[in-house]
């Protein structure tokens, strides 16, 4: 089926969203749909032992170890890194998606149980057309479409099958932070699960709060 779009960034964005929303849902009970889960031989399974260089030149090796008994969970939504040529990525992780886990998230496994779903993000190629450039257009460009739906479905699976009442931290960057912000707004804020949210580390985006306040509101 052909979809005809006018030649504007906004129209192309809407077409991509329509295309993405027609795709089938992921089954997040399948371990292959997760880049990281507790105890898995996956993208978080990395030796992050570090050599610390003191001001006087002394070297100290700091051994890295995960904590399988960590008291909280971390749920991570990674940034725009997919090199797939399509508007949205597929469910086969490319090297960039694996690398960003190691660079940004794996170290958190020393403090929390890791959960990082693979999701069909808007790719680097898709960004050329997926973000509206119209003057005055505001809002969250990733708040609808398969990229959001995947993360929401993974989150709901995690809550139902893995959380078991534990505290959690949301960690996200760039596109992931936009999605996580919307996830908080729709699925967490004002609901019982909010009491379990320890923190949200949302990098590469901004959060609106009520005038005169420094907390509250998404």
Which residues does each PLM region occupy?
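Surface cap/lid and interfacial helix-loop subdomains adjacent to catalytic sites
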Residues: 150-164, 185-218
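Positively charged n-region of N-terminal signal peptides that target proteins for export
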Residues: 1-4
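Bacterial N-terminal signal peptides
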Residues: 7-17
